[in-house]
Structure formats: structure tokens, C-alpha cells
């Protein structure tokens, strides 16, 4: 087994390209007639020849089952305060840091470093991958996109990117927004007749950004409906109405507030409103400065449009059972609180419909605890403090090593295109097996072009085989198997 040491502080990472987005999904090969699931052998879980549902009946989805609130360790931190503060400092650097080594989109040093080539390269890659005349992608009507459609998208995206930093490019997100690979709401699916393609795997869907996220605008689309932006995690296109400009006075105030008191949401779909006025929907992964904490309440800063496209700060009151000061102590009972809100929600490739995929799930889950993870699985495993590569070991050794050395809630498990959080080990089907929390699309049989769909955030064991269908390839039995330790 190969051990790779990485710096104590979360490593810098490259802004992802859409083609590198790893989100619990593997590319298929073209099926033949012998590979398809026959309706005659289908159970009630049958969907169509390339899809069925995986039965979760044997795997409890109760958070209290896997994280008992009455256990002796429920209130014991799983990492020490100094380590947590180190990660929290890295998080604030990514969001608000303005020094030469910081990577905030409001940081002129950082933006200047990527303007020369990276921003243009990302766009060019998307042009070549999705709009080339020989490239075929499908729309929501199961028909291939036309040459005319491709040219319209290319023309709308083909505006100039200034290679010089301008302070006027700084913006902030005022409501959660989807990030697209190109400026269109139209999907671009690979062949929907193949397993693991079509819905929900829209190649243009990259990620989402939460309200309060600092961004830098690189360019407008030709129709002005979209902005091409740099965020702390991705480069892509967002709707123009979801962001507003920030001036130096706003940046100074917002950064000062965030450095003093930064908080995070710990529940899904919190409607942020005041005096009958709705502002945005928040969920885990949304972080905002706050001014003070009153009994049962926080007074929280939210960015709003002042009416002329510029940001101003509005103060709203939030309950302390939905918003907490960061970094929240990383204890089993606290992480269980967040999981109770997040678990059981549908899978969303690239945050489609603001649901999570595998990497978005962990990014959002760990944010309240001051731990900033990148936005794709391959970068997330490299962002941990220490990586153990078990790719050359067999399934038995992989399971035994994780049972013996895994640290609950601070060990990430990576396989190609997918990532999970180890939460401890338990006896499952008479075997001592690692348990995970993950957001997963599904499992696949070896050599069979079909998917057994789970389709959401679940507690799931890393069994060598699954009795529900022994032909399914285990998540432990993949070409790569790496453990990343947050420590």
C-alpha cells in the first residue's frame, strides 16, 4: 500500500473543468442485446432494460441507528481544536483571503494568476467538447442537438475575456444559483439509450453556488442573461440576476465581519426572509457573517441588491437550530444533526435542482465544521492531510485496513468518480464491515450495461458482495481505492 503525505493545510487545487467533474457516475460502453435486463426477470424494482432500483430494505437509514445520540462518544470531538482551526483558516482563505497566497475570487493576486490562460482554457475546452461539429449530444426530447443549436450557444458564449484584473469584476451571489458549463439552460446528455447516460447527467451542469459566495465576473454572454464567473470552487456561467456587484467599501465590511464571526446553516431548505420579504433559500454549505448572538437567535448579514445592481448588507434574524457559529465542534451528535437534514434527499448531478452529488454532499456536510473541500471527488481526496492508496490490494485487505485504521467522520473513501465518508464499522450480514455516508447514483454489474439505482444520500455498507444482487460490483472492488484522512 502506498502512502502519500500532503501538507497539513488543505492543499490548493485547480478550478475544475466540467470534464473533470467526478460525481458518483462512470461512463458506460455501448450495450448489446445480451447485456440488457429482461422484463420477464424483472421484479417490482424494474424500470427499463438499462435501469432497476436497488433495494435498501436491509440497510437502516436511521441516523440514530448509526450515530446513537446516547453513546459515550456522542459529544466527544473527533478532531482537536487546533486541527479544526487550521482547516477553518484555510476555508476563510478560499472565501475571503486577500493575500498573495490566498485563493478568494475577490483577491486580485489570485484572479490575475488565472486570467492569462485558465479562464479561456476552460471555455475553449467546453467549446471543443460539446460544440464541435462532430460531437453529438442529446436534449431533453431525446433528439440530438442540431448544428444551428451549437452555433447559437457558441455565439452567445464567445464574448471577450479581459486578461487584466478589474475591481469592478467583483460580485457576490444573492440567491443560490446553478453553474453551467456554457450559457444555456438546455441540457447536453450523452446517449440516453445507454446505461448511466441521459437524465440526470447533463454535461453542462457543473455545480451550484450559495448565497453569500464571493465571485469574480470574467465576461457577459452576448444576450446578457449569463455571467462567466470564477468562484471558490468552479469556473462557469450563472444567471445574471442571481449576482450583484460589490465595491471596495462592501468588500472591506463583508471580509471584516467574516473574519470576526462566520456562521453556517445546518438544515436543508431554510427560507431566509425578514418582515415578509423573501431573500433566498439556504442549506448546508451556505455560510454568512453574523454580528451577534441573542438568546435563541443570530443576527446575520445577507447580501441583497440595493436596487441598482450593487450589493448592500441587510441584517436578518435566524434561529440557532438552523444556523451555528463556525467552526462548529465536530462531534458525532453535531454531524448527526446535519445528516438528519441532508440524508434521504435525491441525487443531483452537478447540483441539478440544487440536490447534491457525491462530492457536493461532503462539501456541504463538512462546511459548518470549518472544513473546506473542493468540488470534485478526485480533488477532495487530494485535499486531505494524508492519503493511503490501497489500489493494489485485494477487497479483503481494503476492508480490513479501513476497519482497523479508519477514523469515523474524518476519513474519506475514494474510488474512480465517487467519494464517501467513513462513519465507523458494524456487523452487517455476519461480517464486520465499514459503514459509509454517501450520495450515490447506483451500482453496476461487471460487464453488464445497466444500473441498479440508489439515487440519493444514504448510509451504505462497503460489503464485498451485495445479497440483493450478487452480480453487482462492490464499491470496494474498483480499480482505485484510496483513503484520505482529515487530521
Regions found by a protein language model. Give the residues of each.
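C-terminal motif of bacterial Sec signal peptides marking the signal peptidase cleavage site
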Residues: 21-23
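SH3/SH3-like (including bacterial SH3b) beta-barrel domains
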Residues: 190, 196-210, 274-283
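Second-shell loop/turn segments in exported
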Residues: 202, 275, 321-326, 344-353, ...
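Bacterial signal peptide processing site
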Residues: 25-27
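Active-site nucleophilic cysteine motif
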Residues: 339, 349-380
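...with weaker cross-activation on analogous glycine-rich loops/strands in unrelated enzymes
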Residues: 208, 374-446
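Low-complexity, Gly/Ser/Thr/Pro-rich intrinsically disordered linker/tail segments
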Residues: 50, 55-71, 75, 433-435, ...
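Boundary regions of SH3-family modules and the immediately adjacent low-complexity/disordered segments
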Residues: 31-180, 184-191, 196-200, 216, ...
